[in-house]
Amino acid sequence: MTIEHTQDLAQIRAMVPEMRRVKSIHFIGIGGAGMSGIAEVLLNEGYQITGSDIAQNPVTERLVSKGATVYVGHQASNVADASVVVVSTAINEENPEIIAAREARTPIVRRAEMLAELMRFRHGIAVAGTHGKTTTTALVTQIYSEAGLDPTFVNGGLVKSAGTNARLGSSRILIAEADESDASFLHLQPMVSIVTNIEADHMDTYGGDFETLKQTFIDFLHNLPFYGQAVMCVDDPVVRELIPQVSRQVITYGFSEDADIRIENYVQEGQQGKFTVVREGKANLDITLNIPGRHNALNASAAIAVATEDDISDEAILKAMAGTEGTGRRFDHLGEYETGKGVAMLVDDYGHHPTEVDVTIQAARSGWTDKRLVMIFQPHRYSRTRDLYDDFANVLEQVDVLILLDVYSAGEKPIAGADGRSLSRTIRGRGKIDPIFVADINALPSALANVIQGGDLVLTQGAGDVGRVAKQLESLQLDINKMQNA
């Protein structure tokens, strides 16, 4: 450990006390974005970090390079020296490491509980909502970094400008994505909370009851202190409905006329969105946002609302918006490729809910009006496909060419009629487009080779392993030479 790092740790310890009697922290499922981010922050705070996952990936390799120990596979001996065990929601209670920790009476906490501990002595800014959390978290982080405030951040995806999804900063500010999928965001006690939107998702957590989901968001906002701030998107009808029930200071944002932070005159020019932000009692801001789509203008205005309330300079806000590189797998422009039939543009996107897919399609249509849109879509979870089946069909039939993969299960058991083949048949039966169903993802490159044309915008879409299609394109030699990004 360098002298500089020792001095930095001493400065951090003056703000954030050590967790007593905790030396070694073990993460089960350390390769996930949320888990790895917390692990990296704690590693940089001086804790010994170990973890396990079913395979190594770039995230775990990064942690190992920084001094963590990562085991491939789960076994009881991995937790033998752990002071505390952190588990992700994807881990089954019968996991041998959980059983061993329980037998040893080692504390077992969920990811959000450990995030709450990181936030406890800091000025926390939490970003919640069904869609847009990761990008909004990155944009808030970018503004605060541009202002020289050096925040700690923990995001659910790669902050491309930082080259990581988490970083330990030297200030008291912690910016974090808040996960509602298992209601664990109720552990967090931030000073500022953003709610981007609320839709029916992860409904198994909420007993299939949308009213329970809405009440959970209200409870989350009431974790704010009486002097805290709730930043809420007034364009979203469910969020608008909840505002009168929130007994904290509320700042609204959106395109709506009654928004406190209002977006006007939005236009998209290729990869960039340009618009004006109108703020009561403050100068208007003419924003150039280096990521496309009206949905990202909303994400940006949420970040601007928080920064404005914190008296961050307009110069820092404008520079952060123009300079943002976005987040990994969120309309991620991977380049242009020679197909043998002309040049095609490749974009990768993580969106896996119908609303997310829809706004991605609209961004592609708005920015590249002359291109044929070829979507490769991989449904994520059988339960989501079942619950939102008609919504998926309505959204997916908007593209010009649709290649459908089977469902990425994420550990779920198959549900009859909620699979890729069934969805393909339903869309075909509507008569608008004729989907191509590919049962084996390894057969995808050859299926794409049969339909791709010069001038296409090829969009790989979904939260599963569809993102590795770009690598397969190279192996198929659809792109012999990757061209310079446009």
Curated annotation (Swiss-Prot):
Matching InterPro entries, A to Z?
Answer: Mur-like_cat_sf, Mur_ligase_C, Mur_ligase_C_dom_sf, Mur_ligase_cen, Mur_ligase_N, MurCDEF_pg_biosynth, UDP-N-AcMur_Ala_ligase_MurC
List the molecular function annotations (GO) for this entry: ATP binding; UDP-N-acetylmuramate-L-alanine ligase activity
Among SUPFAM superfamilies, the record links this protein to: MurCD N-terminal domain (SSF51984), MurD-like peptide ligases, catalytic domain (SSF53623), MurD-like peptide ligases, peptide-binding domain (SSF53244)
Q: Does the keyword Calcium apply?
A: no
Q: What is one GO biological process annotated to this record?
A: peptidoglycan biosynthetic process
Protein EC: 6.3.2.8
PANTHER family found in the cross-reference section: UDP-N-ACETYLMURAMATE--L-ALANINE LIGASE, UDP-N-ACETYLMURAMATE--L-ALANINE LIGASE-RELATED
Function summary: Cell wall formation.
Read off the NCBIfam families from this record. murC (TIGR01082)
What HAMAP family does the annotation carry?
MurC (MF_00046)
Family classification: Belongs to the MurCDEF family.
Q: Under what name is this protein listed?
A: UDP-N-acetylmuramate--L-alanine ligase
Q: Which organism is it from?
A: Vibrio atlanticus (strain LGP32) (Vibrio splendidus (strain Mel32))
Classification lineage: Bacteria, Pseudomonadati, Pseudomonadota, Gammaproteobacteria, Vibrionales
> Gene encoding this chain?
murC
